[in-house]
Amino acid sequence: MYKNEMTWRIRVYGIVQGVGFRPTVSRHATNHGIYGTVCNKGPYVEIYAQGTKEQIDGFLNSLKEHPPKRAAVLKINTEDITADTTEQFEQFDIIESEKTKGEIFISQDIAICDECKAEMFDPKDRRYLHPFINCTCCGPRLTILDALPYDRERTSMKEFPMCPDCAKEYTDEKTRRYDAQPVCCNQCGPQVYLIGRPERGRAAITYTRRLIREGKIVAIKGIGGFHLCCDATNEEVVCRLRTLKNRPAKPFAVMAKDESVVKRECVVTPEQEAILTGHQKPILLLDRRSDGGLASSVAPNNPKVGVMLPYAPVQLLIFQYDDGIEMPDLLVMTSGNTSGAPICREDEEAVAELSHLCDAMLSHNRKIRIRADDTVMDFYRNEPYMIRRSRGYAPLPFMTKADWKGQVLAVGGELKNTFCIGVDNRFYPSPYVGDLEDLRTVKALQETIHRFQTLLEVKPQAVVCDLHPKYNSTVVAEELGYPVIRVQHHYAHILSCMTENDCHDPVIGVAFDGTGYGTDGTIWGGEILLADYGNFTRFGSITPFLQMGGDASAKEGWRIAVSMIYGYTKDRKRAWEIMETLGLCSEQESRVQFTMADRKINAVASTSAGRLFDAVSAILGIRRRSGFEGEASTALQFAAEAYEQQNLSNISQEQKENKDILLHETKERFVLNTQMLVQQITEAKMRGEDTGMLAYRFHQVLAEMITAACIKAKESSGRDKVALSGGVFQNRLLLRLTEERLLQEGFEVLRHRMIPPNDGGIAIGQAAYGMYQLQK
């Protein structure tokens, strides 16, 4: 070793696999005259750097200031080992990956980068129109991964040996594909083909484009599974897809050719554009323009539409190719599955599940190891507000400052299922799995849990599930063979909000959603909790009502409306007069509901805030039934928002209600007087007052009730932090009105940002509870 030379061992932790980290290290080392090695150890990248103190300092500074675009460096540990080594390095080398134990971070799938896009459409480039073009900065990661460290032989690309040209790029540090594990080209990479037809490669893409142009439906395999695709400007084919999918009203996601098309169709803020065009490319819920070209049946009676940009090369090629076919610049791109089932990822699944839904299926022979549905994101206060966290975001971990040790698996909720693995203070939420009412989704959950345990090298000390004894998620947890910890649904919601915000103080939790199994065996869903990681107390709830008719009541808000009206009138004749005036149901239907209520037939006590919204939507004549989850409550929100927008100058934020009538106290808990609110809304509607105004008033008074309950909880407990969670808080109007009032009253408000407030986010709360229990 030369005089003044030092040798340092440097370990870099974070998302440093599958993002071109080692090639970047090598380039920085060369630029600063550093000799040594870089090696992928799995949990971290290890660097041996030899040079003068000035050279090493410059190298480290470059590494910190200019990491790869997609990397997330969480920490860098350095150690001067000059006194412990006599090794003299002659150059700087990337050496073969080695497996070691430690913190593991897995890269998410990354949308095609601008450089690859430019190459793909350059006729002079050897990857011209290549459907699987990628580089160190972009391409599939999680969805092709078999095991760590992230190297080609541990991905589904191991089946495609590199050609000499690709191998040359792979080993040349001057190229963008230096050490890019999925690197391939038209000669050596995967191929696209039509299932059940002879066309492959270019012919298959041209055939697909022609069908779509002619108004047909095609299933297309992407990065995380199949999509069903058709012309989003063609009313006839969109209606046909709705009929085939048995999806009468739920909005379809749309893929636009580029951001200029999105701006033509939707209102896009600069902050939204940054997410839309970024490397994760979620579906963004955007406000539609009235003069857009989308078929009305894409998102019926909805002021918003979910839009994304192409993130896989093959999707770009559907829009643009050299075959002379003029394509629409907007395509429906909805998950390739039948109702209730997980997204299809294999040809056999697609043939079985999608054949009757489409006219052709464009697939490819790069295997998908883990399904990844598209991420869905809204915006609130000009910030991302996650609705479904999946492709591009999972499995990026959430880290807390808690000094927790252990390993847990949380299986998540029954609906919108995701699971979460906790390792010490790190929590890895899975991609979206789906609703576990379907046994195919249960199987997908079991498969994905097994693969995640393998990738993260985890053997849980406990598995955490919901309290409900008959949920399929509970059965999955029990069958895994680990000790089972059960946690109440709404408590898990609040813990998920606390964990995302890294809050370790006791909080007042407001959990508003559609349903959850309560500790008393009734249906909960409009809850005020006093919570910390160790336990919770039910401090308050909305007014209980009878939820009659089982599953039907979740889809038919008129049933809940009848129950509530009968509940406060306590008189069949008067109740029927109101129902008849409002057109809620037939006289025969009302008699059945009255009898069920009187005799408690198929009737369960409920405090579901979701059903409260459905009932008010029915009473106001907005939606009496929901064709999909949340349709009635979302329509109520849209009516209220439209009224607010049109009457901004006339709306007073000052609340006139006497605080004493917003709440009343029972021997069990405080009760938000939502029965009184429903009665007031009903009577006002019968007087002919404006529907939009009443929809807004409902939101306004409910926010005031929540605030009053939190004030009582603060007086009782001394807590001044409020956590807002549950699917009802996807309603941005209620969230804003509630947050504003709480802030006015001096509360610190915790809310979700990158974890969904709905059931897709509760697994991280379950995992945090389980981890806390392990510390005892």
Identify what each model region corresponds to.
Residues 1-182, 186, 193:
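Intrinsically disordered, low-complexity, mixed-charge
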Residues 66, 169, 323, 327-402, ...:
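Internal gly/pro-rich beta-alpha loop/helix module
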Residues 80, 163, 225-288:
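A phosphate-binding glycine/aspartate-rich beta-alpha loop in the early core of alpha/beta enzymes
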Residues 182, 189-190, 413-451, 563-720, ...:
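A contiguous, well-structured pocket-lining segment that forms one wall/lid of small-molecule binding clefts
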Residues 219, 457-469, 717-728:
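Short glycine-rich phosphate-binding loop at a beta-alpha junction
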Residues 263-268, 317, 343-348, 374-375, ...:
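Conserved phosphate-binding catalytic cores of ATP/NTP-utilizing and phosphoryl-transfer enzymes
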Residues 466, 481-493, 720-723, 732, ...:
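Conserved phosphate-binding/catalytic loops in two-lobed NTP-binding clefts
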Residues 491-512, 516-518, 557-566, 750-776:
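Glycine-rich phosphate-binding/hydrolytic loop that grips phosphoryl groups
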